[in-house]
Structures are given as C-alpha cells and as structure tokens.
From Swiss-Prot:
Species name: Erwinia tasmaniensis (strain DSM 17950 / CFBP 7177 / CIP 109463 / NCPPB 4357 / Et1/99)
Protein name, as recorded: Acetate kinase
UniProt keyword Protease present: no
Gene3D superfamilies: 3.30.420.40
Top-rank taxon: Bacteria
PANTHER family: ACETATE KINASE
Alphabetical list of InterPro entries matching this protein: Ac/propionate_kinase (IPR004372), Aliphatic_acid_kin_short-chain (IPR000890), Aliphatic_acid_kinase_CS (IPR023865), ATPase_NBD (IPR043129)
Any GO CC annotation of this UniProt entry: cytosol
Top-level taxonomy: Bacteria, Pseudomonadati, Pseudomonadota, Gammaproteobacteria, Enterobacterales
Location(s), subcellular: Cytoplasm
EC number: 2.7.2.1
C-alpha cells in the first residue's frame, strides 16, 4: 500500500460517493455510496478489503452524518488506511469561467464555487458542504484539498462553440455561455483512446460520448475539446434519464402562458420529469427501455428519440474534425453497457463509414473495453471511464 493515498469525494444533492485510491496504480482500497439524504431511509454502503457492508444513517441524515460515519465507523475498522491519506480530491460540477483547471482549495476557490452555483444549483452547494465537512474531519489535510472541475476540460472551446446568439452583454456581465460537463470523463477516455489507437493525444481527432443518467458528447480535435453538447448548465444537449436536453426555448413560454405553469414547475419538469422518464411515462432507467424495445410502444418511442438525438450530435461533430475522424468513443453507464443504444445510434451513421460488428458490440459490456466496429471500417471504441482516478491523480500532483 502506498503511503500517499487520496480520498475522493463526490457530493451530490442527495448522495455522497467516496473512495480511497492509490493514484500511482489506480488500486481502490475503499469505495462507497451514501444516499437518500434527508429521507427516513438514508443509508450508506461500502466495500472495504473486498467485503461489502451496509448501514442505516438515521432518518434525515445528510453529508455531515455520512462523512462522520465514514471517518468514525468505516475507517476506524482500519486506522492504518486513514493514516495513509495524503490528500482529498473533490469532484466539482461547475467552475464557471474563473476556475479553469484543478486547484488546491483556498478561500478564493470556495468563493469561485459559490459564484458558479447559479449554473449548478443542485450540485455546487452540495460540493461546498463536502469541502466544509472534509476540512472538519481531516484538519491535518487543510491545505491538501483539491477541487477538480467537470467544466475544466471544455475550457479549450473556441468562442464560436461556447457563445449563445444572445445579447453579448449577457456573456460579458453575467457569464452566460456554454461550459459543458463530464469533462473529467471526456479527458480520461481521450487519454485512453490515444493509447488504444497508438496515436499521440495531440494528434487525436475523436468524438467522445459519455452516456449515463446524464449524458454529453464532446468533439476532440488535436487532443483538445472544441465543442460539447451540454451548455450553461447540464440541461442542454442529449436526451437524458430525466432531463429534456435540447428543445425550442418557446416551449417554456407555452408552458407558462398557455398552461399556466410557474417557473419552478417548468424547471422541475425539464430537469426531473423529462428525458426517458417523460417519453416512457414509466421510468428513467435505460435498461427498461432496452429490455422492452420490441414489445412496448413507450420503450421503443424513448429509445428511438434517444438514439436519433445522439446520432445527430455525432454527425454534426464530425464536421469539426478537420477532415479526419479517428474514432467514436462510448463511455459512462449506458455507453459502456447498452449494446442496443450503440448499435441503433451507429446504424444511422453509415455516411461516416461506421459499421457495427454485432459480436464485438455484445462482448464490450460490463467493464470490458474494445473495438466494436467491423474490421476495416471507422474505429468505434468502448472505454470504461475512471473519473475517480483522474481526481486522485490531480489531487496527488497538486499537493506533492
């Protein structure tokens, strides 16, 4: 075991993911998830030394109770592990325009995360709680906390990609522009794709698709992001689990003026009641959609809209590749595991010279990476992401 392990924290609005990782080799010594915060069934699950355990946190518990449990109960089982933690890495969804790369956390960074909270109101306030609790529980690491931003990798986008066609003063005065998300994942699979394709990252032209409950596509030219599907917030772009993705902005006026919905209700609908959930009227789970595609109209409808939107983005981003597209990459929970999403999407992209090999496509699931295209056709690659490792490596590098 290395003496320089990193505790990685990912605080969501109602959950906390945590892991202790060796940044040198990626070995994971502890991983866990606390969820259902503020509810009677708040609970925590973890895996330590290969053994899975679970406990109730108590009704109404949240980030504070979860981190306290991790330190005083889980790590108490293995004090030598706690002693090896040399840094803490925090996943931060939105860094705005000021926080453009991973950075050691100080008061100015905390203020920057607060300033960007209006662009990620569900996530950034939760991240700030996580930082505060980490500082309380690990006072000896007060100068070893590092923020890693989901928006950072997309900061190489040119102006024509990140500006909206709105009055320019909205950007100049209020930072209204496209920022993207899932940048840590897009960055990781870009590095891995370079290895798989045996190319230097700086020569790589790829389109990366991070598909999970949230989803985004990125255009990577010469190893740098030049466009991505999420915008000012993670609501823009693809069809997602419960998020609408792209829509005509005038739909909002229709919902308000004609149907009498208030702004809060519209926001709730677009973020929590749309996407696969809205299209099926049953669930946000892609597995339901895949399992029932041939037998239920709601599942077919949702899958077809999902794949149509995804194919449109891949097709449009091919125009940004300077005439050479090296590969299309799939990652994230759906991207790594749904052979159906990949096949139905890629079948729409014959113009790009893409042909799916059915056998390879079925094989590249459940943590297995691999090429899924037919030999001699445009490379398409499934790569499991590892955002936690990137966060651990950045935290280790910046606090060394």
């Amino acid at each position: 075991m290395s003496s320089k392990l990193v505790l990685v924290l990912n605080c969501g609005s109602s959950s906390l993911k945590f892991a202790i990782i060796d940044p040198a080799n990626g070995d994971e010594y502890l991983s866990g998830l606390a969820e259902c915060f503020h509810l009677p069934e708040a609970r925590i699950k973890w895996k330590l030394d290969g053994a899975k355990q679970e406990a109730a946190l108590g009704a109404g518990a949240a980030h504070s109770e979860a981190l306290n449990f991790m330190v005083k109960t889980i790590l108490a089982q293995k004090p030598e592990l706690s002693a090896q933690i040399a840094a803490i890495g925090h996943r931060i969804v939105h860094g705005g325009e000021k926080l453009t790369h991973s950075v050691v956390i100080d008061e100015s960074v905390i203020q920057g995360i607060k300033d960007a909270s209006s662009f990620a109101p569900l996530h950034n306030p939760a991240h700030l709680i996580g930082i505060d609790e980490a500082l309380k529980n690990f006072p000896h690491l007060s100068d070893k906390n590092v923020a890693v931003f989901d928006t950072a990798f997309h900061q190489t986008m040119p102006e024509e990609s990140y500006l909206y066609a709105l009055p320019y003063k909205l950007y100049k005065e209020h930072g209204v522009r496209r920022y993207g998300a899932h940048g840590t994942s897009h960055y990781y699979v870009t590095q891995e794709a370079a290895k798989a394709l045996n190319k230097p990252v700086s020569e790589l032209n790829i389109i990366t698709c991070h598909l999970g409950n949230g989803g985004s596509v990125a255009a990577i030219r010469h190893g740098e992001c030049v466009d991505t599907s999420m915008g000012l917030t993670p609501l823009e772009g693809l069809v997602m689990g419960t998020r609408s993705g792209d829509l005509d902005p005038a739909i909002i006026f229709f919902l308000h003026d004609t149907l009498g919905m208030n702004v809060g209700a519209i926001n709730n609908m677009l973020t929590k009641e749309s996407g696969l959930l809205g299209l099926t009227e049953v669930t946000s789970d892609c597995r339901y959609v895949e399992d029932n595609y041939d037998s239920k109209a709601d599942a077919k409808r949702a899958m077809d809209v999902y794949c149509h939107r995804l194919a449109k983005y891949i097709g449009s981003y091919s125009a940004q590749m300077d005439g050479r597209l090296d590969a299309v990459i799939f990652t994230g929970g759906i991207g790594e595991n749904s052979s159906m999403v990949r096949e139905l999407t890629l079948n729409k992209l014959a113009l790009l010279g893409i042909e799916v090999d059915a056998e390879r496509n079925l094989a590249a699931r459940f943590g297995k990476s691999g090429f899924i295209n037919k030999e001699g056709t445009r490379p398409v690659l499934v790569l499991p992401t590892n955002e936690e490792l990137v966060i651990a490596q950045d935290a280790s590098r910046l606090t060394a």
